[in-house]
Amino acid sequence: MNGMDYIQQILNDDDINILLQKSNQTYHLQSICINNSNFTSSEIELSCRLAFLLIGLSFHENTNPKWAEYAYKLLKNIHIKENEDREIFDKIMGYELDNVSLIYYFYLSSLALILDKTISARLDLKQFVDFEDVESSWSQRVLAGIFKALFFLIRKSDGFEDIRRAISEISNLQKEQVKFEDQYLNQFDVQTQKEEALILVGLYHTSKALTETAEYLINGYNYKKRIDNVVRQHIDIALDLIPSDVRLRDFISIINKDLQSLIRHSIWNGTAFQDQIKKLCEFKSSHNILELLPSQRQAMQQNLFDVYANASIVQMPTSAGKTMLAEFNIVLTKSLRKDAKVVYVVPSRALVNQVYFDLRKDLSAIGFNVERTSSASEIDPTEADFLIADDVDVIVSTPEKLDLLIRRSHPSVEDVSLFIIDEAHTIEN
């Protein structure tokens, strides 16, 4: 029996299966704000042990993705702010840190990232409470600072402000290094002193990987280095310097995966192929939109921007980022033909106004003019004038008003380069 089969056999155990089902039910109840957490101490302990086992496997290649999901939901069973749960967690999953909640939130947010639950990771980290100067040794302070800086990079609750907090966290460690490092190392014998010094240098390289990622997230297209290579170089050095502390090596390896996820999810990644797209992304970043949602990234990977396609269909839930993808398509269409006109069709008058204001806010920043049709059942003279103006780039309309314009052979819809149909399945109704 290989290792994978052995893990699956454990998961098929009746008691484990009941716990996993209960965790899944509790997780979904919590997602609709129903707190039905009634786990016994023995169930919390089993949750910790099983989560610890699955976490160790979840960040390796070719691992069953369900294991990360199981581990994430098991951790959600644990109320780390409650003394009993925290003590159980510390006994099983703790490390050389006084503030064990750092490890809890590190695992929780890292699992969320690997599962592409970026919003869940950010929401989870809003629950994290920072305790100042709680760590007793210098190496603990450095590791705690690295965790906190990582949390800021993932959370982004204040956009660039959280990213700057991450940089500040590492900067404070650099200032404290002069005060605490020698004092910390001098307490050891020569051999141990050498080992501890190498561990510290490894942690410093890990912190450098964090600050480089933060600089990339802030500077975007102006960051001149290959950020993925920079991060990998610092992490590789850190792992080489820490050969024997298996747990610390695991932390650093997971941090590497977290940083690579943040880079891939960034609004700067994969959007530098066209100048106007870059300008749009820079505008959005100034309004604290710093990463693409999973649905947006997936759509971009599936050749949504194929300019030779006659039609593209995107099926996404509400608030999944369709408008931003539409804006990218508008910009690409205009880049191919400066006088191109785009008609954006939405199913209701209320949505006409909403989409109009959203598009105008974003696209006017890069010089595009957005107009909307009126709610009138006929075409009034004022409307007719602005719809055929040469500087109109995008028209937002309901299907009914568009149908009227087409039936009247109105000049505004004679030469349209791109139709964007929102809620296309409702048009027949």
Feature locations, PLM:
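N-terminal helicase ATP-binding lobe
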Residues: 1-429
